[in-house]
């Protein structure tokens, strides 16, 4: 018989840097889950990623206090800011441009995000990422 799901917990944790401090500790602790077990498993799963990149994770908590988790790819906004070399997006993206990204950079980001995007082709994924870039106040070249 399948285990009963009691909660879905969505967090953004830095790759390879999960620890019992907030947001991980309180979110798992109130569900009675083993915090250190999650931290070790998450850090092992994200060891191939660049340390410190925010990584969305969806934790499924079961009634017997066990859990499973799925890691997603880093948010497009974080990858775009890194590619453009800016610390934050524009407060007024239509009038104030804060940086530039090239078509090649968009393609690289689209390849990283491919599994999480609903786009059927790479070209559609690139257009999606380009739209995100424009909404952040980045100029798309190429």
Curated annotation (Swiss-Prot):
GO cellular component: cytosolic large ribosomal subunit
Protein name: Large ribosomal subunit protein uL11
InterPro entries: Ribosomal_uL11 (IPR000911), Ribosomal_uL11_bac-typ (IPR006519), Ribosomal_uL11_C (IPR020783), Ribosomal_uL11_C_sf (IPR036769), Ribosomal_uL11_CS (IPR020785), Ribosomal_uL11_N (IPR020784), Ribosomal_uL11_N_sf (IPR036796)
SMART domains according to UniProt: RL11
Family the UniProt entry places it in: Belongs to the universal ribosomal protein uL11 family.
Post-translational modification comment from the UniProt entry: One or more lysine residues are methylated.
Entry's Gene Ontology molecular function annotations: large ribosomal subunit rRNA binding; structural constituent of ribosome
Native species: Xanthomonas campestris pv. campestris (strain B100)
Pfam families for the chain: Ribosomal_L11, Ribosomal_L11_N
Protein origin, superkingdom: Bacteria
Gene Ontology biological-process entries: translation
HAMAP family, alphabetized: Ribosomal_uL11
Subunit structure: Part of the ribosomal stalk of the 50S ribosomal subunit. Interacts with L10 and the large rRNA to form the base of the stalk. L10 forms an elongated spine to which L12 dimers bind in a sequential fashion forming a multimeric L10(L12)X complex.
């Amino acid at each position: 018989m399948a285990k009963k799901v009691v909660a879905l917990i969505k967090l953004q944790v830095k790759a390879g840097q999960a620890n019992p401090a907030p947001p991980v500790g309180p979110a798992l602790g109130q569900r009675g889950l083993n915090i250190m077990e999650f931290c070790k498993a998450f850090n092992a799963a994200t060891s191939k990623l660049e340390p410190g990149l925010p990584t969305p994770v969806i934790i499924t908590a079961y009634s017997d206090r066990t859990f499973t988790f799925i890691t997603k790819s880093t948010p497009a906004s974080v990858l775009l800011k890194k590619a453009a070399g800016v610390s934050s997006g524009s407060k007024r993206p239509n009038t104030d441009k804060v940086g530039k990204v090239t078509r090649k950079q968009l393609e690289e980001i689209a390849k990283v995000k491919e599994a999480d995007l609903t786009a059927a082709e790479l070209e559609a994924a690139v257009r999606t990422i380009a739209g995100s870039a424009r909404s952040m106040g980045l100029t798309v070249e190429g």
